[in-house]
Amino acid sequence: GLLLASPANPTGVVMSNADIEHICKWCHANGVRLIMDEIYHGLTFETRPTSAVLHSDSAIVVNSFSKYFCMTGWRLGWMILPDDLLEITERLAQNLYIGPSRPMQEGAMAAFDDYVTLDQNVLRYRENRDVLLRELPPEFFGDMAPADGAFYLYADLTQLSKMPLNATDFVNAMLREAHVACTSGVDFDQEQGHQHLRLSYAGSTDDMKKASCRINSWLPSYLKSLSS
């Protein structure tokens, strides 16, 4: 099978509708089962992406209440399955966790009643992204694909210094000295992640501005300490 995520974590990259349609057709022609992670659907800033289910009768689509609906911790989601997988998936679900409780299901249904508030959150995420892109050193994002969805930026450390930087050391020092938390890229990519870090902008816009100021104030001294 082929597993894809759009919008993606950790990069925030959103696949074009044409690319999703093309991949669906390729998978169908080559007998490959497509598993599409659409957990960050709704959190896009330029266009609303299509769903793989609109282009394929055999694709598996996975979604969640955690991200767009702001229900992280409820551990609720859903799958859209082709007919040939319904029975076996139902058996697995019944044996693994039976199902969510009735109050959880009622709460999830209520989440569909207020898209105005949810879309306001998306506007805030977009503003937060723009703050970080504007305020942080441009070297962070020079070679990265545009982050048009989710609420993450995947920053590149290779252009910040002539000396190679280790992402794990970098994020630990930034947390300890600048009091800004982010995630080392090695959590997502064991081969090249040591040169990248993921920033989340799911918080308040004020927090994004404060974080940018702290990083900009801290970064020169940190880079200087490495060369001394």
Language-model segments: residues:
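Conserved core segment of the aminotransferase class I/II
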Residues: 57-126, 130-135, 217-220, 224-226
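Residue-level recognition of strand-loop junctions within catalytic nucleotide-signaling folds
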Residues: 82-83, 113, 156-158, 202-204
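A generic structural signal for well-ordered alpha-helical segments
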Residues: 27, 136-137, 174-175
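Active-site pre-lysine segment of PLP-dependent enzymes
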Residues: 8-34, 38-71, 84
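Conserved glycine-rich beta-strand-loop-beta hairpin in the small C-terminal domain of fold type I
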Residues: 109, 125-133, 144-158
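PLP-dependent enzyme catalytic core of the Aspartate aminotransferase-like
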Residues: 163-165, 173-181, 188-228
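Generic structural signal for small/hydrophobic residues in well-ordered secondary structure
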Residues: 2, 9, 37, 59, ...
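A short linear hydrophobic-aromatic micro-motif
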Residues: 140-144, 181-187
